[in-house]
């Protein structure tokens, strides 16, 4: 084991004041010289994915003490994307990732901890902590709060939060009654935990396993299961072994590990937000990773599992089918799909970790010889509308749809788009453009779950494409293309599209184009008056000045 970092605040005559303060915080004489462990929690009452994490913090601290460490718990902030959806609150969601990363870095660096247990769960909390772990680079393990169970309607049908969002659109279109919508609302979110489909939170918690920063089960063991509590205890104990081996996050998160994470993402059809967060993570880890490389992973990794919202199969079903380890083990049978020699938090390789984890239900995790598609469930599109790339969750697109072209219907905000969709300004065959909603323009790159849910609920899901420099909830599905870079607020091509322009989306060829004569296009660019920031005070004003487009991970640069 390397020399303890905490010696900086515990050893020597001149550290007597430091020890005095530590004694006041409950540290005993025999604790000096033991590893000091940061227990980075994210308990918060208003977020259902986090309401139970106070208990998990206690389990972690108990396990750390039993293993010979001294735990110190602190908390980060958290935003519930579902509650923040569809109003100004969503502007704070992605920016909260940076606050979380900065706050974790601040607490851990100021107090010279020797190791860290991160207890995240929901959308921006997991990536925020991952980014911080890369910056600090001390032995760290991730243990998420776990997913909630799927809801069930009175007729036994499984549902999730996305069912409720889409239910609003269905109700407004006259497809269901008020009592049907009330039932969806009542039963859509039945327990604590991260929402029950392959949405952003669960995608990132599953990817933490593939990255090697979490033990098997992190992404799929239900929040309410006794198995989850035992998993939390086991993970905390593992950290103490990781400290002895001096394995740090940057030893684990290499180019190979990021390939493995995206391979899992492709196999499970994860949220498009994983691209945004993993690119930000790579930046913090000092790993250069391009969008083109993501397409290369998609070319060699098949789509093996179609989970909610793209189907009625939920995270609990994935767990029963063998979980992430079984999915990875199935992928490992294809040469070149994974880097099996990648290091994990235990000191074992990924190959050693997943060995023996067989698929228990091939209806949930398809075999290699019968994938949903030969290419992975995410794709990066390029073209004159997205010179620096755009993202589509191909795993959420209806089977058989690989191309869409039609006239643009342009909106300068999500609110305007939602109003236009509700008022039937969007019809079959259209391409909805929602711009000035990127990291800088939003600001905060808000999610477009309300418009996509409205489109699906009205029965237009397979018949309308939606393109935006904003992003999508993991609960979104259909022809939803987001993360268009550069964004409109930076003078990206979306800023120059007009109603009626012919737009082409070709998933197979990875193309996103608009057909406008070059002379006309240059005229529009010359006439563009620039972007006036929507927020001029507070954190969002500072954020919008420093944030970059989605192709960089939406990171902040000075």
UniProtKB/Swiss-Prot annotation:
Q: Which cofactor does it need?
A: [2Fe-2S] cluster; Mg(2+)
Q: Which Gene3D superfamilies match?
A: IlvD/EDD C-terminal domain-like
Binding, [2Fe-2S] cluster = 122, 195
Q: What is its EC number?
A: 4.2.1.9
GO terms for CC? cytosol
| Reactions accelerated catalytically | (2R)-2,3-dihydroxy-3-methylbutanoate = 3-methyl-2-oxobutanoate + H2O; (2R,3R)-2,3-dihydroxy-3-methylpentanoate = (S)-3-methyl-2-oxopentanoate + H2O
**Claim: Protein biosynthesis is one of the keywords in the record:** no
Which SUPFAM superfamilies does the record match to this protein? IlvD/EDD N-terminal domain-like, LeuD/IlvD-like
What is the active site of this protein? 473
- Which superkingdom heads the taxonomic lineage of this protein's source? Bacteria
GO terms under biological process: isoleucine biosynthetic process; L-valine biosynthetic process
Tell me the residue numbers annotated for binding Mg(2+): 81, 123-124, 447
User: Family per UniProt?
Assistant: Belongs to the IlvD/Edd family.
Under the subunit heading, UniProt states: Homodimer.
Question: What protein is this chain from?
Answer: Dihydroxy-acid dehydratase
Record gene name: ilvD
